[in-house]
A protein has these predicted regions:
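Mixed-charge (Asp/Glu-Lys/Arg
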Residues: 1-132
Length: 132
């Protein structure tokens, strides 16, 4: 979570539990239009493959929940909705996992607001921003 703060995000909050609706972590950034844009992060340990297992379906369901279920932002004291969902994993996205997740979300605008971070990308960002 310190990485998100170093990237300039604010209101970083850990939400893991049964009422997180696909958002293990939430945070925001102020846009160029002086409005807040909210992000949700679904965190998974290990690799995610495009094989016939429950990981893909679970991630699709959680991403849909993250977009559709508002959350209470304790900082603004308002119910808000996520604009972007980040799927962050400690391992790698293997085979066709990313494609299956994107295609599993039917709504076109939502597909364009998914961000995939694997362990290598996370390490690279941490290394780059740990200097600041």
């Amino acid at each position: 979570m310190p990485l998100f703060r170093k990237l300039g995000f604010v209101n970083v909050k850990y939400n893991h539990g049964n009422k997180e609706f696909g958002k293990d972590v939430t945070f925001a950034r102020r846009t160029e239009f002086d409005e807040y844009e909210y992000y949700g992060v679904q965190v998974k340990f290990g690799d995610v493959s495009g094989g016939a297992n429950g990981d893909i379906n679970e991630l699709i369901t959680q991403a849909k929940d993250a977009f559709s279920m508002p959350f209470y932002d304790v900082y603004s004291r308002n119910k808000v909705r996520i604009s972007k969902v980040i799927i962050a994993i400690s391992g790698k996205f293997t085979l066709n996992a990313v494609e299956k997740i994107i295609e599993g979300i039917q709504e076109y605008p939502l597909k364009n607001n998914l961000i995939f971070l694997d362990g290598e990308k996370i390490e690279s960002l941490m290394s780059k921003y740990s200097r600041f």
